Amino acid sequence: MQVTALRGRTAIVGRMDFRRSERADEWLRRLEDFLARFVLPFNAAWHAAAAEGRPAAFVADLRALAREEGLWNLCLPGLPADAPGTALSHLDYAPLAEAMGRLPWAAEVFNCNAPDSGNMELLLRSASPAQRERWLAPLLAGTIRSAFAMSEPDVASSDPTNLQAEVRREGDTLVLNGRKWFVTGAAHPECRLLLVMARNADAGADAHHAHSIVLVPADAAGVELVRNIPVVHHVAPEGHCEIVFRQVRVPAGELLGAWGEGFALAQARLGPGRVHHCMRTIGQCELALGLACDRALERRAFGRPLAQQANVQEWLADSRIEIDQARLLVLRTAWSLDQPVPPADLREQVAAIKLVAARLQQRVVDRAMQVFGAMGLSPDTPLAALWTWGRALRIMDGPDEVHLRTVARGELKRAGEQRGKWADYFTTPEQMRAEPRVR
């Protein structure tokens, strides 16, 4: 398949093919079997542990078993040949991420959970040999966990150029000061590494080259975990934490990439991670739709099954159509990420899928809750938790408005490059009087 640039977009010579490869089919079969035999039976126990605010101890045993089965690091196309696990392309991994999404903790079993997956992707891309040995190797092995500290409570973090946490260079040392929050994963007892985005003390006027990413040991002097922040009253065992950095000193060798490259590194981290998030979200929507269909078939009201009520049929049909639309959009982005020459509109694609998936989840789950009635509000089904998570997703990893802005800017940029392209489609009086000529 050949890919050529055309008017700011990408012209596909040949075709996009989203059919699952035989390799993806085989690994999906193995994953589904593992989920059914080993993970789903522990789901109630996991929720019991989560309700107590602690990680479930048995997850470590499941992780060891998954690694033995090769169901490990599946989300990393660039996985080194000597690293544990199985490398899959973004497109091949997408259906596996969807299957994992049905349980909030399944991705963790396979070492494919955020933020570790994105952090490993970033370290594979930009870490020095020493950083790879100290941080990447144990992350790939699953012996440590990590977190990514970007958002801040004192600025509008939806614009990352606002970030105020500061890093300065003192000889061969980096000194970090600032406050971060919603640092996912930082409360996990095995979290050893914080990737911290901070503004350079010597930053110039170029806002997009004013920040750097520093690798900070979680137990470094001056790092204070202030609290694990509940998200809509739910306290995640792994944490969405507020952290204060006071005169935290690390060797200059813990700078990731180049000085001032933090913004570009953070952007590069987002693409694969959003495909993973969105496919897991689609898996959750499939779960919600499946539960709603079962409920509609077995529940009766006003003398007939809910499945025969016209409005319920509309809800189910709308959900099926919207899920399939969203899946195709995400698969296109996964395919684009796999191309040797990424399409010119890849950034807009990534923004679009994040927006679509988060909104989709709220709509599909809301309909399912309506089918279930009071039970849909209870903890007896996963629906209330899924709805809550869908609402959080519309802010986490960038609010809807930022993604809409990205898509609109790309569209307007292309329109500006093609001014006048659509003028002949007007039917003004002058055009109506014009005499068309074939020759």
Model-predicted segments: where are they?
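N-terminal amphipathic/basic-hydrophobic helices that include classical n-h-c signal peptides
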Residues: M1-R15
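Alpha-helical interface subdomain recognition
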Residues: V13-P104, N113, S126-Q131, P138, ...
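Short glycine/proline-enriched turns and hinge-like loops at secondary-structure junctions
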Residues: A87-L88, S158-T161, A186-C191, D206-A210, ...
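N-terminal glycine-rich flavin-associated loop
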Residues: E108-A130, D159
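A short, Trp-centered hydrophobic/proline-enriched beta-strand micro-motif
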Residues: G142-S151, V196
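Flexible, small-/acidic-enriched active-site or ligand-binding loops
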Residues: N162, A221-R249
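A short core secondary-structure module
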Residues: T173, N177-L225
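Long, acidic (Asp/Glu-rich), low-complexity accessory segments flanking structured domains
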Residues: Q247-A264
